[in-house]
Design a protein with these regions (language model features):
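Helical mechanochemical/support elements of P-loop NTPase systems and associated helical scaffolds
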Residues: 12-15, 74-80, 107, 163-166, ...
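Hydrophobic/aromatic beta-strand patches that form the interior of the parallel beta-sheet core
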Residues: 4-6, 55-57, 132, 145-146, ...
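Conserved helicase/translocase motor-coupling segment
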Residues: 31-114
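Helicase C-terminal subdomain and adjacent C-terminal extension
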Residues: 1, 121, 156-256
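Short, conserved catalytic or adaptor-binding loops enriched in Gly and charged residues
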Residues: 22, 44-49, 119-125
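Conserved helicase C-terminal RecA-like lobe
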Residues: 87-101, 105-172, 184-188, 204-210
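Alpha-helical scaffold elements adjacent to nucleotide-binding pockets in ATP/GTP-utilizing enzyme cores
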Residues: 15-23, 110-114, 173, 195, ...
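Conserved coupling/interface region of RecA-like P-loop/ASCE motor cores
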Residues: 1-40, 103-105, 184
Length: 256
């Protein structure tokens, strides 16, 4: 079946659809919802830019091999995830409205354990927060999505994250707010991630710091973005196919 090209999205706050539209749809993806329809209370989360419910929180912790020997985890990113989740819960967000997305089973298992054992709130509350793989979240949505990228190493390798379809899915699951945590120095080696990080920076949403209420703009150097490289173009095409195929499988409902 030939996928229908997505033209209108009804899920995301308009600022969250901007990068997917530019990266995968040549800027043609239209918004079927307004900012007012996707606005949350200003008290819910200390967004770096109050009018844009998104952020990339730079974490420089080193990745580790998981106990299985076949996956990866990142303790520093798990710490950041807990801080974000706790802040949302403490400000009235229901745990079933929060999703934590990661490309690695090792990180998924570690985050689940970290939240219940180390979190500042009662373990039973964290147990209601869904922590799952990128693939498990395809075709689904949450009010708030937290993405932990995991990879952080001297070799500058990002493994599964090289698949643009996974990035595409991760970026398009949130309705009201998107938080990402990762190592921008490592991720920026991949052209599509580099463009995404530059997008966060252009919107003053690429931040760093230890206190979630006092994050500062991250000044890490990023390679110059090259939107029209062959690699980036191919990545955008493949990632767009993921949304188109998902759209076709959902009875042609244009809901990214």
């Amino acid at each position: 079946v030939q996928p229908i090209r997505l033209q209108v999205q009804y899920r995301m706050h308009p600022c969250l659809s901007e990068f997917p539209s530019n990266a995968f749809y040549e800027g043609t993806l239209q918004n079927g919802v307004t900012e007012a329809e996707r606005a949350d209370s200003e008290e819910v989360f200390p967004w770096p830019c109050p009018s844009k419910p998104m952020m990339f929180w730079a974490q420089m912790g080193v990745e580790e091999m998981s106990a299985s020997g076949y996956s990866y985890l990142n303790r520093g990113e798990a710490y950041a995830v807990e801080k974000i989740v706790a802040h949302l819960l403490q400000n009235g967000i229901s745990p079933d409205e929060i999703g934590v997305v990661t490309p690695y089973e090792g990180q998924r298992a570690y985050v689940v354990n970290y939240l219940t054992r180390t979190g500042v709130l009662h373990p039973s509350i964290y147990q209601e927060v869904e922590v799952a793989s990128v693939d498990a979240f395809q075709g689904r949505e949450k009010q708030y999505i937290i993405v932990t990228c995991v990879r952080s190493n001297d070799r500058q390798g990002i493994g599964f994250l090289n698949d643009p379809r996974r990035l595409n899915v991760a970026l398009t699951r949130a309705k009201l707010g998107l938080m990402m945590v990762g190592n921008p120095k490592v991720l920026a080696k991949q052209p599509l991630f580099r463009d995404m990080l530059q997008h966060f920076r252009d919107n003053k949403c690429l931040v760093e710091g230890n206190n979630i209420n006092q994050l500062n703009e991250c000044m890490v150097a990023l390679p110059q973005a090259r939107w029209k490289t062959r690699a980036a173009g191919l990545a955008r095409f493949r990632a767009k196919q993921t949304i188109d195929e998902e759209n076709a499988s959902e009875n042609y409902n244009v809901n990214v």
